[in-house]
């Protein structure tokens, strides 16, 4: 009964947060505010190749999302600008997002140490390394940072370590009104039941999940059912990553049944942001983002 109450609380919190973050303006090409149960955001990772090779400037991300794709909410990726992310840079990111009327949703944080490492000193350092990103998220107006619950050892050993690491980071983030959310991102974290156990172990309203449609590869030889995994993680979700790859002639993703996935998302009572995260190799980054957006709008408009 306690678990059900907690899930109900998280669902209600997600709805309240989504309601507060609704924007007063719409893109001419987007139907989401009026006709869909969720909001569309753009994950910076969808353009990671262009940011990495210098074709695009991370400072222009908000402008690109709004003007190129008609999307008014963005999800940052720390590794694409971590080498220059001092206070002045973060302030400039915020200014540019504000100038273009774009909401900063979250920061996906990588390469700051493993929060699930069984080495206590390394885990403590990893927690501390994430502090600056909590502060950056607060400055940008994000509601969360996305972290990884990685570590070496048995499933139980890493679970216990992740509960400790996430718990300590969440206590810090709570003081800044920031959520700490974990993505299924390989290893044990791609096992839905394992990550649920971690969430229950942390048992903090600011610690949740970021279900990703595609990241359910546990190892080179083991995968977890993506639909089962998303369903298991949704009760704790404070965000959703709509991972897309390649598309058929009808505009559907070949690898992921978006209609089925979004029904799972809706059935969980989620009404927040669904982030476009394109990783295909048949379309370019721009075309892949547009295709994913069209698919989300097509599926979403039929469900609302």
PLM features per residue range, with description:
Residues 2-139, 157-160, 174, 192-193, ...:
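N-terminal pre-domain/capping segments
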């Amino acid at each position: 009964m306690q678990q059900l109450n907690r899930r109900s609380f998280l669902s209600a919190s997600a709805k309240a947060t989504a309601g507060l973050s609704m924007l007063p303006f719409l893109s001419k090409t987007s139907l989401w505010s009026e006709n869909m149960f969720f909001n569309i955001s753009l994950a910076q990772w969808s353009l990671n190749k262009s940011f990495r090779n210098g074709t695009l400037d991370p400072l222009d991300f908000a402008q690109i999302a709004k003007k190129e794709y008609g999307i008014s909410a963005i999800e940052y990726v720390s590794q694409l600008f971590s080498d220059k992310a001092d206070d002045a840079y973060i302030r400039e990111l915020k200014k540019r997002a504000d100038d273009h009327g774009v909401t900063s949703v979250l920061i996906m944080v990588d390469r700051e140490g493993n929060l699930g490492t069984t080495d206590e000193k390394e885990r403590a350092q990893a927690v501390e390394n994430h502090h600056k990103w909590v502060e950056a998220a607060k400055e940008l107006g994000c509601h969360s940072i996305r972290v990884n619950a990685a570590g070496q050892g048995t499933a139980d050993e890493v679970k216990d370590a992740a509960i400790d690491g996430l718990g300590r980071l969440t206590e810090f983030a709570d003081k800044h009104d920031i959520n700490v959310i974990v993505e299924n991102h390989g290893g044990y974290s791609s096992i839905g039941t394992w990550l649920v156990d971690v969430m229950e172990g942390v048992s903090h309203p600011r610690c949740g999940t970021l279900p990703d449609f595609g990241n359910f590869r546990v190892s080179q030889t083991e995968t977890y059912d993506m639909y089962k995994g998303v369903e298991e993680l949704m009760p704790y979700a404070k965000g959703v990553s709509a991972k897309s790859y390649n598309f058929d002639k009808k505009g559907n993703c070949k690898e992921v049944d978006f209609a089925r996935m979004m029904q799972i998302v809706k059935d969980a009572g989620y009404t927040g942001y669904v982030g476009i995260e394109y990783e295909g190799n048949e379309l370019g980054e721009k075309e892949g983002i547009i295709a994913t957006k069209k698919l989300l709008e097509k599926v979403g408009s039929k469900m609302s």
